[in-house]
Amino acid sequence: MAWPDTLPRRGLYLITPDRADSAALFAACEQVLAARPALLQYRNKSTDPALRLAQAHTLRALTRAAGVGLIINDDVALAEQVGADGVHLGRDDGDIAAARARLGEHAILGASCYDQLPLAHAAVAAGANYIAFGAVCPSTTKPNAVRAPLSLFADSAALGVPRVAIGGIT
């Protein structure tokens, strides 16, 4: 469950928008990867599995070339298929312990904890490498998302894992 030595534990964590236009997605990602973020999360809620697989494979190649970690949102099988560095799971997207068992101890596992410190404790106990709280700002992609108070970041420091602010940060 250790964090990979090849990836930074701090830095910018970018999340892709849902985009069916692969060329536009890849062009945007190439630009941001030049800035060397810590991680890039591929998030595409499309129901087209072929599109998601093709995009994820290309993003894996782009992130490898840039030395940036690739996290797949909500899809352990896709993360496994493309050799991603890990997966990010929301409350209804799968079990952290099951993902750890499937992806192994070197995978990066993240968990959405919304505005709930008990979820963060449970996620870390189940094997999460990082926790995410949010939305910290109003979000256009999830306009009804609950707002997470910034105090959660201090309150969760003792968990000893990186904490990520998500939601409405553009």
Q: Where are the predicted features?
A:
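Conserved N-terminal beta1-alpha1 strand-loop-helix module at the mouth
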Residues: 1-96, 101-129, 145-148, 155, ...
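Short hydrophobic "strand-cap" motifs at the C-terminus of beta-strands
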Residues: 166
